[in-house]
Amino acid sequence: MEATADLLKEGEKAKIAGLTEGQFSLKLAEMGCVPGTEIIRLYESSGGSTIAYRIDTYLLGLRKEEARLIQVEPIETVIP
């Protein structure tokens, strides 16, 4: 099974490995989600529909289905 950003646990750090082909993939790339960039899952909204990530040096909120388009390679766990 391929690791994707929606499967990262809170505080888990990874490198973006690629993007799944799709209409939203170009938008993700424009927002800085490019291979080699560091991504950390920060927290989930109270309703569970949105996940906050730190991508390089900024915060980005994504729906779970959007985060599923980001392929990742986990590198370490960060204790919040």
Model-predicted segments: where are they?
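A structural micro-motif recognizing beta-strand termini
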Residues: 18-22
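Conserved hydrophobic positions within beta-strands
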Residues: 16, 39-41
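C-terminal structural segments of small proteins and small subunits
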Residues: 48, 52-80
